[in-house]
Amino acid sequence: MLLNNALLLLLLALAVAAGWTLGRNGLRMDLAGRAQLPSQYYRGFNFLLDGEEEDAVDAFTEALAVNEETLDTHIALGSVLRKRGEVDRAIRIHQNLLKRPQLTAVQLHQSHLELARDFIAAGLYDRAEQLLVDLATESSEFTATAQQHLLDVYEAQRDWSAAVAIAEALIASAESEGQSAAGQGQPASQLRGHYLCEQAEAAVASGDQAAARALYEQALRDRPRDLRALMGLVRCALEAGDATLAMEYFHRVMDSERRCTPEMLDLLRAICAAQEDPSLYMTSLERYYNQQHSPLLALALAEELSQRNGREIADEFLRATLNQHPSASVAASLALNALRSEDSQPECHVLDQLIRDDHGYQCDHCGFTGKARHWRCPGCRHWDSIHYLGGALEQVNGR
């Protein structure tokens, strides 16, 4: 609806601009010597009054000459069409601009950039890449913008090495100007770290653990607390059979994240199992729970206490936890244990599944929610914007 309104407003502006330009530049005269507007202008108004916006667009763009004064109107129209999904028509408008030699170099470069955006929207990444590479080379004014759009292209193509190179170019350029480098509205160093981690994960998939470790370490140079790289190094150390090194990295993981998440708990279990120390998992849970009082850690610790010392000891711990750090999920776990003592199997099963499955993640940027962590939001495509919420029970409880 907003885009439709924007198009209508733009069409009105286009009509006014066309009339003004025609009036300023002189009208054609009929046989009687009277001023005459071109037929496309009248056709455009008729289409607009009939609600036929698409035909009105074509008529007004034919009537409105392309020059320095009308360029912004043409570009704005193409942008609205692109956002409406009418990419082919946006491409035609912007290609038409590039055929106009009377435009200045800056205006041609601006048209160049808009056409590249059209190609990206259409999924024509090879054509967009060539335009953007040329633009970054030819125009210092548009270099950074072109490079930022190249990141869009390389991300879509999963060409992570090319993306790393562009991110590094943005960082170097910003440093030379004493500024902070940004790409797609995020720090270029942050993007570079994720691109390196993507390369590392590809190396893991191909069985090259050494290359993966090197790439994860490279990602940590600029961002020593990068959670993704640290978790990757934990997995690499486990794969190499070095549980001690894995635990060292895991300590850094816990220091970098404000609350324990399910995948972090899985890593801890794997590390402790690899070290073959029966008490290590329990002591680690106690250590981390004392640091952050996470309900997830409390439940894991209670489960371990139940297996080692019996359910009564576990319930005592949960009751103490509930008094000191109120939590709906801890209360639900206590209720589950009470149901078990009454042998209420159906209710036990339902509540047990609720507690085990009760966790979620949310994007800070667009609000996307899911059950698993994504390093890049599937909704808004921002990197590193999804964080652990805890469970629905914790959200109801306001924690």
Protein language model annotation of sequence segments:
Residues 1-31:
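N-terminal signal-anchor transmembrane alpha helix of single-pass membrane proteins
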Residues 29, 98-107, 138-141, 173-189:
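Flexible helix-coil transition and linker loops at the boundaries of alpha-helical arrays
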Residues 33-69, 76, 82-86, 92, ...:
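Alpha-helical segment of the N-proximal tetratricopeptide repeat
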Residues 43, 77, 115, 150, ...:
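Structural register within alpha-helical repeat arrays
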Residues 47, 81, 119, 154, ...:
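Residue at a conserved register position within TPR or TPR-like alpha-solenoid repeats
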Residues 68, 102, 106, 140-141, ...:
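Short coil turns that delineate tetratricopeptide repeat
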Residues 73, 107, 111, 145-146, ...:
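TPR alpha-solenoid repeat register
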Residues 90-99, 125-135, 162-172, 209-217, ...:
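Alpha-helical repeat scaffolds
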